[in-house]
Amino acid sequence: MSFKPLYDRIAIKPIEHEEKTKGGIIIPDTAKEKPMQGEVVAVGKGVRNEKGEVHPLELKVGDKVLYGKWAGTEIKVKGEDLIVMKESDVFGIIN
């Protein structure tokens, strides 16, 4: 199964953070913060305006982005965890 978002939605692969502290303590899954950075892996075609014209999305596949802690819906595609959200839920692109 592959996944293609519709309209103004994007699919993001979260960038996982280190699972150990600097002191060597392993952080259990239940105590981990939800990652708020990720890489765009798929984008929709955009939304239609009042004239019926498609307004394309600004984000592109491969962009590294910063998003809200509770943004989007988590899904699993081919065993890979993804987050689907609207482009407007993204705060910005990380250079």
Curated annotation (Swiss-Prot):
InterPro entries xrefs: Chaperonin_GroES (IPR020818), Chaperonin_GroES_sf (IPR037124), Chaprnonin_Cpn10_CS (IPR018369), GroES-like_sf (IPR011032)
Entry's Gene Ontology BP terms: chaperone cofactor-dependent protein refolding
Pfam family membership, one: Cpn10
Top-level taxon: Bacteria
GO MF: ATP binding; metal ion binding; protein folding chaperone; protein-folding chaperone binding; unfolded protein binding
PROSITE patterns: CHAPERONINS_CPN10 (PS00681)
CDD domains membership: cpn10
Keywords, ordered alphabetically: Chaperone, Cytoplasm
Subcellular location: Cytoplasm
A GO CC term attached to the entry: cytoplasm
Stored HAMAP family: CH10
Function: Together with the chaperonin GroEL, plays an essential role in assisting protein folding. The GroEL-GroES system forms a nano-cage that allows encapsulation of the non-native substrate proteins and provides a physical environment optimized to promote and accelerate protein folding. GroES binds to the apical surface of the GroEL ring, thereby capping the opening of the GroEL channel.
NCBIfam families attached to this UniProt entry: PRK00364.1-2, PRK00364.1-5, PRK00364.2-2, PRK00364.2-4
Oligomeric and partner information: Heptamer of 7 subunits arranged in a ring. Interacts with the chaperonin GroEL.
Family the entry assigns: Belongs to the GroES chaperonin family.
Protein name: Co-chaperonin GroES
Species, as recorded: Rickettsia bellii (strain OSU 85-389)
Organismal lineage: Bacteria, Pseudomonadati, Pseudomonadota, Alphaproteobacteria, Rickettsiales
